[in-house]
């Protein structure tokens, strides 16, 4: 049974599919935070065109956020998973084994991130919303001038009879 997480944002909705088999600890953290409402009303604090959109920090600064395991937890790097294109769901970190609640979604291939960030899913639907986010006007610190935020995140259990 796959786990999907649906996001309603100020720019539209999108759904991500989690790679539970490849990054079980990361997926459990992400799904649990979403289920608890942790991501509700959190802004996308960093958007870089042709690179990625980043969110998951309840302080909105890019320096906050914690995991369900405490402050930070270890990477789950899978050599078979790569940042090969747009729509890759990956953990943001400030170095090895430093994962909390922040995550990003790629807007294009980012091979230099391979082996440095845990890939734990992909955008399943609503990629156009993510692409539109990547085009918003930002300031010199890559923060959107007009706020882009997650209104609500929720778990969508897939039964397999799609």
Swiss-Prot record:
Signal peptide: none annotated. Residues 1-155 form the PPIase cyclophilin-type domain. Gene3D superfamilies: Cyclophilin-like (2.40.100.10). InterPro entries: Cyclophilin-like_dom_sf, Cyclophilin-type_PPIase, Cyclophilin-type_PPIase_CS, Cyclophilin-type_PPIase_dom, Cyclophilin_A-like. Its EC number is 5.2.1.8. The keyword Transmembrane helix does not apply. PROSITE patterns: CSA_PPIASE_1, CSA_PPIASE_2. GO terms for molecular function: peptidyl-prolyl cis-trans isomerase activity. GO terms for biological process: protein folding. It comes from the Eukaryota. Keywords: Isomerase, Rotamase. One of its GO terms (cellular component) is catalytic step 2 spliceosome. It catalyses: [protein]-peptidylproline (omega=180) = [protein]-peptidylproline (omega=0). The keyword Isomerase applies. PPIases accelerate the folding of proteins. It catalyzes the cis-trans isomerization of proline imidic peptide bonds in oligopeptides. Belongs to the cyclophilin-type PPIase family. PPIL1 subfamily. This is Peptidyl-prolyl cis-trans isomerase-like 1. It comes from Aspergillus niger.
């Amino acid at each position: 049974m796959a786990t999907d997480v649906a996001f309603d944002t100020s720019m539209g909705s999108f759904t991500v599919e989690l790679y539970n088999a490849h990054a079980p600890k990361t997926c459990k953290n992400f799904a649990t935070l979403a289920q608890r409402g942790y991501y509700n009303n959190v802004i996308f604090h960093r958007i870089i065109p042709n690179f990625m959109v980043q969110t998951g920090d309840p302080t909105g600064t890019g320096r906050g956020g914690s995991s369900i395991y405490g402050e930070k937890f270890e990477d789950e790097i899978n050599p078979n998973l790569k940042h090969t294109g747009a729509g890759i769901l990956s953990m943001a970190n400030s170095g090895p084994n430093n994962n909390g609640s922040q995550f990003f979604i790629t807007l294009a291939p980012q091979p230099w991130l391979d082996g440095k960030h845990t890939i734990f899913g992909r955008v399943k639907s609503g990629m156009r919303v993510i692409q539109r986010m990547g085009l918003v006007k930002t300031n010199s610190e890559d923060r959107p001038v007009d706020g882009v935020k997650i209104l609500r995140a929720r778990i969508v259990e897939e039964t397999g009879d799609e």
